[in-house]
Amino acid sequence: MYQPDFPTVPFRLGLYPVVDSVAWIERLLEAGVRTIQLRIKDKRDEEVEADVIAAIALGRRYNARLFINDYWRLAIKHRAYGVHLGQEDLETTDLKAIQAAGLRLGVSTHDDMEIDVALAAKPSYIALGHVFPTQTKQMPSAPQGLAQLASHIERLADYPTVAIGGISLERATAVLATGVGSIAVVSAITQAADWRAATAQLLDIAGVGDE
């Protein structure tokens, strides 16, 4: 039963790009994306605060679901739509502060044990990955593949889910066929020969999400 301790999100968040700059946030929101994440790694809060402020402002302008990866204090301070955390961040994050601020929470998982940990936090959505091999970040776990993803989806039933990891334009339809609510993409857009065309095609497949 989907009863999170955080504000709910639609079961289908649609196409969900994960990008590392405000420039990408702006161009993708202009292109019609309505769920997006700013993921900047390994910088101090003061180094990324201006980018977080700018990203959140863009999210409001386009009435989009703008998630901030990791920098939960800044997300609370500047009232982002939501925060996304990795498993390693859950123990060091004040989840009650995020909850009290009314922000949505997404949590990454890589196996059944991590899904248990995520469910205990009762987040707004659960990310499942990595589905395929990915060059975007070093991953200690093995790719899950479509069969394992489908198994996780069956277990999570009505919980909003996001598949991530190595999802290309060519693989997007097969990933969504598992029943997952949304697909997160990185290089499928940012490294595409024509990012506008790739975004438009992915939006055709995954949509912009439910209201």
UniProtKB/Swiss-Prot annotation:
Which coenzyme or cofactor does it need?
A: Mg(2+)
Pfam families given in the database record: TMP-TENI
Annotated GO biological process: thiamine biosynthetic process; thiamine diphosphate biosynthetic process
Q: How is the cofactor bound?
A: Binds 1 Mg(2+) ion per subunit.
Question: What GO MF annotations does this protein's record show?
Answer: magnesium ion binding; thiamine-phosphate diphosphorylase activity
Sorted alphabetically, which keywords does the UniProt record give? Magnesium, Metal-binding, Thiamine biosynthesis, Transferase
Alphabetized Gene3D superfamilies for the sequence: Aldolase class I
Its cellular-component GO annotations read: cytoplasm
- The EC number(s) given in the record are 2.5.1.3
Catalysed reaction, written as an equation: 2-[(2R,5Z)-2-carboxy-4-methylthiazol-5(2H)-ylidene]ethyl phosphate + 4-amino-2-methyl-5-(diphosphooxymethyl)pyrimidine + 2 H(+) = thiamine phosphate + CO2 + diphosphate; 2-(2-carboxy-4-methylthiazol-5-yl)ethyl phosphate + 4-amino-2-methyl-5-(diphosphooxymethyl)pyrimidine + 2 H(+) = thiamine phosphate + CO2 + diphosphate; 4-methyl-5-(2-phosphooxyethyl)-thiazole + 4-amino-2-methyl-5-(diphosphooxymethyl)pyrimidine + H(+) = thiamine phosphate + diphosphate
> Top-level EC class, please?
transferase
Q: Which residues form a coiled coil?
A: none
Q: Which InterPro entries match?
A: Aldolase_TIM, ThiamineP_synth_sf, ThiamineP_synth_TenI, TMP_synthase
List of residues binding 2-[(2R,5Z)-2-carboxy-4-methylthiazol-5(2H)-ylidene]ethyl phosphate: T134, Q135, T136, G166, V186, S187
- Pathway(s) of this molecule: Cofactor biosynthesis; thiamine diphosphate biosynthesis; thiamine phosphate from 4-amino-2-methyl-5-diphosphomethylpyrimidine and 4-methyl-5-(2-phosphoethyl)-thiazole: step 1/1
NCBIfam families attached to this UniProt entry: PRK03512.1, thiE
Q: Which family does it belong to?
A: Belongs to the thiamine-phosphate synthase family.
Function description: Condenses 4-methyl-5-(beta-hydroxyethyl)thiazole monophosphate (THZ-P) and 2-methyl-4-amino-5-hydroxymethyl pyrimidine pyrophosphate (HMP-PP) to form thiamine monophosphate (TMP).
Q: What is this protein called?
A: Thiamine-phosphate synthase
Q: Which organism is it from?
A: Salmonella dublin (strain CT_02021853)
Q: Which gene encodes it?
A: thiE
